[in-house]
Amino acid sequence: MSVDEDNLLQGRVLSVHGLQSKVLGDNGVLYACAVRQVLKSLSTSQRNVIVAGDRVWFRSESRDGVSLKSEADGMIERVEPRTGMISRTSRGRQHVLVSNIDAMLIIASAEQPGIKPALIDRMILTAHQCQIEPIVIINKVDLIDLVDLQPLIGVYSSLGYRVLPTSAETGQNVAYLRALLKDRQTALAGQSGVGKSSLLNAVQPGLGLAIGAVSSDNDKGKHTTTASQLIPLADGGAVFDTPGIRQFQLWDISAGEVAGLMPDLRPYVSGCRYPDCLHLAEDDCAVKTAVADARIDARRYDAYCHLLEEELM
């Protein structure tokens, strides 16, 4: 879509609320922007009109560059091509959560709610598909004996993933996490109640993000983040706080692609007898042989089977 860039400003979308988007202009001014009608008509089942993280061109509608409100008004005219998108399935369609990121912070909790490796594995697959770095954070480690987590940490670490145990309550590894986020565009993903908002408040005191409790009846957290939002960090970079995801379904990944996205299964895929082998019940399967020989961790293979059988078949 062609626009007259000479009369437009550039900025980045911080959050989207219904028909209005908060855009931080490159000039440092915060704008409340509507979306040009022609952009809405371009929306398809594969693309949201505007999402947090989008780079946009917009027209300022404030008088002489001075707003009559706390935020200047604007009209978004064009969205730049997206990179590093994270999506999930919503009612059978792609729902883009955030765009233009280079890392995904996958936050789980050791307790309240308990850790769910299958959810971590699904998020890691999504990060690989988006070609962004997955980083695993296990929060609330003050509630358990860290020795109990060592086998799980060992599995992910052996695959080359960074794994960081943290506690927003005690401050454990918060300084390391702050350094890890510096000058990066990072999405936070995890189910409700794992402590995403608490960690952000610890990383950057003064944010004042709302913190929800975990239900003692079902061990599930309450949603405190209701829409994806970009939060600039004082030390450089930004994080995208996304709504808690209880069922993080894979988007646009076929059953035949999953093994190739798992670094521990990938080396054995080409050794199978059948090119379309799914490594479940087929004969002469190199992946199953590697599991039997303990060259592939049995828990990881079980997670692979669960992903295929529960979500992709």
UniProtKB/Swiss-Prot annotation:
Its cofactor is Zn(2+). InterPro entries: G_CP_dom, NA-bd_OB-fold, P-loop_NTPase, Ribosome_biogen_GTPase_RsgA, RsgA_GTPase_dom. It is found in: Cytoplasm. GO terms for cellular component: cytoplasm. Binds 1 zinc ion per subunit. Residues 89-248 form the CP-type G domain. GTP binds at N139, K140, V141, D142, G190, Q191, S192, G193, V194, G195, K196, S197, S198. Keywords: Cytoplasm, GTP-binding, Hydrolase, Metal-binding, Nucleotide-binding, Ribosome biogenesis, RNA-binding, rRNA-binding, Zinc. CDD domains: YjeQ_EngC. It comes from the Bacteria. PROSITE patterns: ENGC_GTPASE, G_CP. Its EC number is 3.6.1.-. It is an enzyme of class 3 (hydrolase). One of several proteins that assist in the late maturation steps of the functional core of the 30S ribosomal subunit. Helps release RbfA from mature subunits. May play a role in the assembly of ribosomal proteins into the subunit. Circularly permuted GTPase that catalyzes slow GTP hydrolysis, GTPase activity is stimulated by the 30S ribosomal subunit. Belongs to the TRAFAC class YlqF/YawG GTPase family. RsgA subfamily. HAMAP family: GTPase_RsgA. This is Small ribosomal subunit biogenesis GTPase RsgA. It comes from Rhodopirellula baltica (strain DSM 10527 / NCIMB 13988 / SH1).
